Regions:
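Alpha-helical transmembrane segments that form the membrane-embedded catalytic/substrate-binding core
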Residues: 44, 79-87, 181-190
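Accessory "access/gating" subregions that flank catalytic or transport cores
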Residues: 18-24, 30-39, 48-58, 68-74, ...
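Well-ordered mid-protein domain cores that form the structural environment of catalytic cofactors
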Residues: 1-29
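Short amphipathic alpha-helical segments at helix boundaries and their inter-helical linkers
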Residues: 9-15, 77-80, 114-119, 187-189
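Short low-complexity stretches enriched in small and charged residues
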Residues: 2-7, 40-44, 149-150
């Protein structure tokens, strides 16, 4: 917690809320829960590359680090589940290049009923049934409309949509993920 207060410059959204909570005496994961309307957002899963890089081919180690990091500003929200999912995918990607197998690894690490898993399963259903990527994108948006914009379930699915529908073509994967819209710096970077 002290590192966050002293070294993390942003004061907006989940970052500012968790820092304020810690200054008020709450420790993680409560710092990411209390009065935090952003606990389902994207701030944690976009930081997971470091944990995967520190634990290549070791998803369980990567998700341990990701969970410790994510709970500070996302508590037990969907943002933390997204970080766990993405850290597992990225860590396993050091030794696997089968996108579907990577997604299955990520899904195996998060609760089946969480919204991140729900969005990923909807994506897989669309892909497996030959649904056009734009239609799939719209279904993902509709499915998570109650959460609002800049939320992890839909945006993680957008990143995975790019990889699935891109079918191994890096440029196409990037274009698809970014063209889904919403938090495009997150979806494109992942």
């Amino acid at each position: 917690g002290e590192y966050w207060i002293d070294s993390i410059p942003p004061h907006w959204n989940e970052y500012g809320i968790c820092k304020g909570n810690m200054r008020g005496g709450l420790v993680p994961p409560l710092s990411g829960e209390y009065h935090n309307d952003w606990k389902d957002s994207n701030g944690a899963w976009i930081r997971t590359e470091i944990w995967a890089g520190m634990a290549p081919a070791s998803p369980d180690t990567a998700i341990r680090y990701a969970r410790e990091d994510a709970c500070v500003d996302h508590g037990s929200g969907e943002g933390t589940y997204a970080a766990i999912f993405v850290a597992a995918v990225e860590s396993a990607a050091f030794v696997l290049n089968d996108i579907r197998a990577l997604i299955d690894i990520g899904l195996s690490k998060i609760p089946e009923k969480c919204r991140v898993a729900q969005s990923i399963r909807l994506l897989l259903d669309c892909y497996d049934n030959g649904v056009d990527w734009k239609v799939c994108r719209n279904r993902l948006v509709e499915d998570s409309a109650d959460l609002g914009w800049f939320e992890a379930p839909c945006n993680v699915a957008f990143a995975m949509l790019g990889m699935l529908y891109g079918e191994g073509d890096f440029k196409r994967s990037m274009i698809l993920a970014i063209n889904c819209g919403d938090d495009t710096d997150c979806t494109g970077a992942t």
